[in-house]
Amino acid sequence: MGAKFHKTFVLAARIAFLVYVGMVVYVCFGHFDDLPDMSRPIWGIPQDKIIHFIMFFPFPIIAALALDLRPARYGKAFLEVLMLLVCGLAIAAATEIGQGFTDYRDPSVWDWVADISALVGSTLIVLTVLLIKVRRSCRNTAASAS
C-alpha cells in the first residue's frame, strides 16, 4: 500500500469516526416522537437493546482505523486495545448518564449492558487483527534478519 493511499485512508477513517460519533450522539439524544413501538422483542431481546448493540459495535473498529494503530509488540497491542475499550465504555456511560438530564429520555443500565457487550465483542475482533499483524511483523523482521 502506497504512502499516499495510506494517508488518504487514515484521513477518511478519521472523518468516518467523527461522523459516526455525531450519529451516535444524535441517536442517543434526539427527540423522536414518531418512532414505532420498540417494546416487541426479537428472539427475546428488546429491540432498543439490539439498537444499542448495533450502535456501539463499530466504535473500536472505526477508532482503531482512525488512530492508525500499528503496534510492534504484543503488549502495546493489548494496551492500545484496552484504551479503545475504556474510551468506548466511557462514551457509552456518558450517553446514558446524559439521557438522565433530558425530559424525554430515560437512562438505562440495561442499555449500557448492551453497549458493553457490543464494545467487548468488537474490541476482541480488533485485538485479534492487531495480534495477527504483530505476529506477521515479528516473522518478517526475523526472516529479514537471517
Listing of model-derived features with the role each one plays in the protein:
Residues M1-A66, L84:
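"…centered on the first transmembrane helix and the immediately adjacent amphipathic helix/loop
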Residues F29-G30, F101-T102, V129:
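Helix-loop junctions at the membrane-solvent interface of multi-pass transporters
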Residues I45-I50, A77-V81, S108-W112:
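Hydrophobic, aromatic-rich alpha-helical transmembrane segments
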Residues M55-P71, S117-K133:
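Membrane-interfacial alpha-helical segments at the cytosolic side of multi-pass membrane proteins
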Residues P71-V86:
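Internal alpha-helical transmembrane segments of multi-pass membrane proteins
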Residues S137-S146:
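Short, charged juxtamembrane terminal tails flanking transmembrane helices
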